[in-house]
Every structure is written in structure tokens, then in C-alpha cells.
Amino acid sequence: MQSWSDTALPSVPGQGPPLRLYDTADRQVRPVTPGKKATMYVCGITPYDATHLGHAATYLTFDLVNRIWRDAGHDVHYVQNVTDVDDPLFERANRDGEDWIVLGIRETALFREDMEALRVLPPKDYIGAVESVNEVVELVEKFVASGAAYIVDDAEFPDVYFRADATEQFGYESGYDRATMEKFFAERGGDPDRVGKRNPLDALVWRAERPGEPSWPSPFGPGRPGWHIECAAIALNRIGSGFDVQGGGSDLIFPHHEFSAAHAESATGDRRFARHYVHTGMIGLDGEKMSKSRGNLVFVSKLRGEGVDPAAIRLGLLSGHYRQDRAWTDQVLEDAQSRLKVWREAAALDSAPSATDTVARLRQHLADDLDTPKALDALDGWARRAIEGGGSDTQAPGEFADAVDALLGISLR
């Protein structure tokens, strides 16, 4: 699947401290220690409703990780999937009387446009679930052969399920107890009451063909992949096991990320799918959770269509800490627009105070679990001093603009 256009990053003098991120599995902030090549997998959209601000906030978070790694000289191998075969996609297509393939193609194209407008660096591998069906089939075959998965006794719909107890470490990523797992499993796409399952938490890895649904051939009959196994297969076949960062929204911790890790660990025998599990908070609107069911989603494309500068959208989403649930309001956008105006005014000056210390503080705050509120405050301080007329460094405005571009993804020129 085609990604979107890359952009060259300005070179910024100096070097920041090593990146530290909160690890969901370890419940603490700890160093991220990639080698020369840094590897990251971030779960992509299901293309039927793109791109709302919750999506955007997640991809902006991991764009910062990508930029920090590049700034440190790493070669970044970033992989992102598109869940272009899944129940919500079919449901939306049926509701609107539209072909699910056409819907998926259109929404994926819109997502790419939004990401490019927001200046999100593209993944090296941008892979649709449809493209990876053969990889999923290979994994499911392995699971069935090893006993990690089984076919339910159902002559009409012989689905294949992965045993929740197939790995002894299952549950380490979320840290949830059984009751919490069962609650989220039922709420987030699971089927605990499916007749024939051995354990309510067993996860679907191959859905037998149903009328009106797409299907692909397999040794266990025609059907399509389950959700969690798609990410396991895509990641394993591109960056392998033990990659540096797996990312996504906090609503993916369980069951999606817990099971994708369990699938991969069962296949490889490794104890840990990713070295770091990183999750972003949810975005609300005016004090309410932003969700499809509430009908209060705010879309990047709608804001762009209203003439809002994508840099202001980006800056507004970066104004809160990535791990916090936070609200999007008119005031957040207005504050971002005002901040952007001040920064651009400062970057256009002929001279200003030295920006060296400010750039160092920007790097320091971003390296400390992506502390964007402190990073933005540091930049605000320099911009105010510059506009007030202090400083005679003719290189400083350009250095400031380059650092904001390279590290935050915001163009001031």
C-alpha cells in the first residue's frame, strides 16, 4: 500500500539526551535504547471514519519519537498497518450502501492527505491487512499445529481461536486482572459468549466465511483474519520480534496489543514482542469523550476545509502531554493559533537572543517522556524575548525555526 510523501528535516546543531518513555508493561518511564536502526510499529486506522483528532494525536505522538530518533542519527524503520478488512468497515459500508473496498480506499486516501498536511513523517512500510492475509494464514497454521489455537466444533462456521493461556506471560502488558480483561474484551471487539470457545478470553484468529463477507482460502477453510493477528503478522514479517517501540492509543492496550503480543510470542518463543509498549491518552471534546457512538468526532479534514492551518491543529494537540486524556476545545485551537503567530513572528526577525540554550531545553524536555508542555513553554519564552527586541544573534531566528521544524514538525517559514 502506498504511503504519503516524506519531507526532509533540517539539520540542528548539537545532540539531545537519550529518549525515555513510559512503558505500559513495566509501569515506569525508562530509556529507549535502539541500535543504529530504530524500529517502531504503530497500529493504523480502520478506514471508515478518518481522520479524527484522536487518530491525529496518536500519530503525532509517534511522529515525535521518529523525529527524535532521526535527530539522534538513527535509521528509523517505521511500520504502520491499515485494518482494511474488519467488521466496522463492513458495517459502515452496509449502512451507507457502499462497497467496502471503495469506502476503505477513499478513507485511506483521506488519511494520507491529513497526515501529509499535519507533516507526519510517513512509515517505511504502510501495510494493509488485505495484503498480509497469506502471512496471517501461515501464523494460524503454526498455532493450530502447536496447539496454541483450535477450530471450534461448528459445522457451519468453524472459526479458529487462539488460546489465552497459550503463553505463560499473557497479561503482562496490560497488568489487568481477569475481571477487567473480560470487561474490556466484551467492549472492544471480543466475543466472550461464542459457543464452542474453551475460554471466554480466547481470541479469534481466523473467521470462517460468512454470507456477504469477503474471504480468502486457507487450510482451515475460506475466511478472513481476526484483528489482533494482523498486527502480529505484519510486524513480525517486517521488523521481527523484539523491536523497539509498539505504539497506539490507550484503548488498544487490551485486548488488541495484549493479544498481538501473545500471538507473536507464541510464534517465536520470545518472552516479549516489543521492548517498549507506549500508549497515548484519549482526546475529548468540550469535556466529553470523543467517540463514534456520541457523534462528536472532530475531523482533521473538516478543520482544514474550514481554513484552519494544519500547523495550528498539530500545535494544539501537542500542547497537552501525550499520556493524558485531554480535551479539544475552541480555546485549545485559539491558543495554538496565537502561539503559532508569535513563533512565526519571532522566526522572521533579523536578529534575536541566542537560541542555543532554548534548543537544548527543547531536546531535553522531548527526551523526557515527550514532555511537550514544557518544551512549548521553553519556546514561548525565547519567542517573547526575541520579539521584545533583545539579542543580536543573526543566526538565532533560523536556528529556532529549524529546531521547531525538525523536532516538532511545525514549519515557521
From Swiss-Prot:
Zn(2+) binds at residues 43, 231, 256. It catalyses: 1D-myo-inositol 2-amino-2-deoxy-alpha-D-glucopyranoside + L-cysteine + ATP = 1D-myo-inositol 2-(L-cysteinylamino)-2-deoxy-alpha-D-glucopyranoside + AMP + diphosphate + H(+). GO terms for biological process: cysteinyl-tRNA aminoacylation; mycothiol biosynthetic process. It is an enzyme of class 6 (ligase). Its cofactor is Zn(2+). L-cysteinyl-5'-AMP binds at residues 43-46, 58, 81-83, 227, 249-251, 283. GO terms for molecular function: ATP binding; cysteine-glucosaminylinositol ligase activity; cysteine-tRNA ligase activity; zinc ion binding. Catalyzes the ATP-dependent condensation of GlcN-Ins and L-cysteine to form L-Cys-GlcN-Ins. This is L-cysteine:1D-myo-inositol 2-amino-2-deoxy-alpha-D-glucopyranoside ligase. It comes from Rhodococcus erythropolis (strain PR4 / NBRC 100887).
